[in-house]
């Protein structure tokens, strides 16, 4: 049975590749119209939009460079909001720089903060007025496993700082917007290195977590599918860790 979507419309940022691509297709299978953004010069959105269209729902792709000047990003997002009545935001954009802090630069800092935190703020700001007007909205942001408790990750000082900011932002958004029928959540994927791997394939492999297998895009997509349901209206401000029970500090390999 498909979750109740009632022809709702989702916008998945970064939907051309990686985990956001899988989430986009999963939402389409649930009956959502799914529109995506993609980075100019990056992965072509065609593969994703074709997969969405195959599910019999509406789709479109929009070029948005979330690392561009804030005014340019705002204009691009406002244009999307004018054209599409978005009920569900899945903000999948979130670049990562793996580098010990002693080697990190201000350019790395800008990329992490702008690409992860500022991008989330701008996406929410563009879509919030429409959600308020329709008295319904679901916003999903992404942290990393442990970002809700500021768990350290060697080589990811700037990334973890930005993701912890995303958690604080989403929780505050949930507090302020709940009265308008808008919920906000953070999904924290664990160490998912092969973004195209299926769950059945992952079960044949091992990993150092409580479950004993690697995570997959399907695990993350199922979490998102649950949180954006019509009848998930009593859940908000949730930080859902999809990491196979992994606890403790990361030892990220870095140059």
Language-model regions, residue ranges each:
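Conserved NAD(P)H cofactor-binding loop of Rossmann-fold oxidoreductase domains
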Residues: 92-98, 244-245
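Substrate-binding pocket helix/loop in short-chain dehydrogenase/reductase
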Residues: 97-101, 108-113, 205
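Short, small/polar-rich loop/turn modules that mediate ligand/substrate recognition or access, typified
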Residues: 178, 183, 235-237
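Short C-terminal tail/terminal secondary-structure segment
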Residues: 203, 225, 236-255
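A short, exposed helix-loop element centered on a Lys and neighboring polar residues
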Residues: 124-125, 171
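Canonical Rossmann dinucleotide-binding motif of NAD(H)/NADP(H)-dependent dehydrogenases/reductases
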Residues: 2-35
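Catalytic loop of short-chain dehydrogenase/reductase
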Residues: 140-165, 170-179, 191
